[in-house]
Amino acid sequence: MGADNELSEFEKQRLANIAERDALLKKLSLDAQSSGLFPPKSARSSPGGQTKPKKKPPPKKVKKEDEHPVPRRMSSRLRGLAADSEVAKRKADEQYEAAQQAERAKRVRKSDAFSFSEMLVSGQKLSGDSLIGVDVVTKGVAMPYQRTFGDEDIKKTTDKELKALREEMSGLRLWEAWEPNRIKLTPERIYTMTFHPSEAKPLIFAGDKMGNLGVLDASQEKPTSAVKQEDDEDAEDDDPDPVLTTLKPHTRTISSLHIHPSKPTHLYSASYDSSIRELDLEKTTSVEKYAPESTSDDIPISGIDMAPDDPNTLYWTTLDGAFGRYDTRASRRSAVATWQLSEKKIGGFSLFPTHPHFFATASLDRTMRLWDIRKLSHDDPVPVGEHVSRLSVSHAAFNSAGQIATSSYDDTLKIYDFGSKGIAAWEPGYTLSDAEMKPDTIVRHNCQTGRWVTILRPQWQANPQSSIQRFCIGNMNRFVDVYSSSGDQLAQLGGDGITAVPAVAVFHRSTNWIAGGTASGKICLWM
């Protein structure tokens, strides 16, 4: 027991000494660290034997005052400044007005006479003899490429004359010299087209949205050197485009073109710039034939027509719903007569060719109206009769047989036969009842053109070679449809290379040539 107690006392003393020594060493270590003699103990090493360095705390950012501080937004009152001066305000108003006036100036019509060089936009110089020839100087949904009329319909035709005409019209083929997507006749969307009356060669005129006039002589042939050989890979790059001419006689949309058959060297064009101009195809000059007295008067013209027996009198309609007449041989002040026929725009009109005192109008107010100039009051004009459609009527086209074809946004083509009702013998003041004004034939046709396609309008052939009257109209499925006056479809013209809707479709007045114009300024020609 004694030994155990002694060891125990000894052990206690030893432990006390160890504790005292450790305390002394710890005190010395702390004193040394505080004086900077030794670095602090390193962190424990990781299991892999590598020590992980401690992240250094980011240095404290000391906010420095900017030598040139950015001024804060403050009101003029807090800055102690006076309100903007009247001079500054007036200057800003003048700059704005100048910009607006410059924009308006681009759209104001030019009343001066133009030479060819002043109108030329692109293409070759026009030559009167080579251009027109010696003989002339004398609601549906569009389904692209889906046909609604074809060979099977022709085979089922029992009427011999109708079948022969269907075969003839369906036999028309696209101009082979160039594909339609190569024939860009105008820079912008085509609004109107017409053929020159010459039968010697197809000569086409097209007016676009910006006042450009395109001219194409389709008798030209592709140069033989440009014909691509099967084994020549580079021939396509050398293939020239057709020779075209582009003029700019107007500052705004050309809405209508007309060539009088007894005056074939003169082309009349009507425009939204409120003017009607005459282009002399021999002299290649353009002069203004009609316009409001002031250039500031904005009266866009929507259509133009002339009586076959009178090459001097112009008839027109406006987007304001007015109808006008002017004998170009007299002064404008005394010879211009106008009638306000509608509160809304008249989109299209035409004269009855054989009795031009009758004319038909199509309006945004959903009406097709028949008028007689012999009994037309300026104060309260009353039509011979009118027919109201479900939606707006785009155009009303008269043919030589006294029939009117209209297109409407209710997706119908309507045909009114006033020839069978004795229109040629009607006396001034004759009127028709609502029942007598109903259409004789209604054809379903998709007329939903939308914003980017020109409105579809029917156009008759002026002098057909057979007793069957016929008209053409664009088809939203990228065709041109041909119908008879009884509503029978005669043809549906298409072909390779037609990449857009040929919305503007026109017949040559006597030959079975048909042209269609697209929103990209390109044309298709069937012959």
From Swiss-Prot:
MF annotations from Gene Ontology: DNA binding
Coiled coil: none
A single GO cellular-component term on record: nuclear periphery
Name used for this protein in its record: DNA damage-binding protein cmr1
Pfam family, one: WD40
Bias (Basic residues): 52-62
Region (Disordered): 32-98, 216-247
Similarity remark: Belongs to the WD repeat DDB2/WDR76 family.
Record flagged with keyword DNA damage: yes
Swiss-Prot/TrEMBL WD repeat ranges: 185-226, 249-289, 296-336, 341-381, 388-427, 450-493, 496-527
Organism: Aspergillus fumigatus (strain ATCC MYA-4609 / CBS 101355 / FGSC A1100 / Af293)
UniProt-listed GO biological process terms: DNA damage response; regulation of DNA damage checkpoint
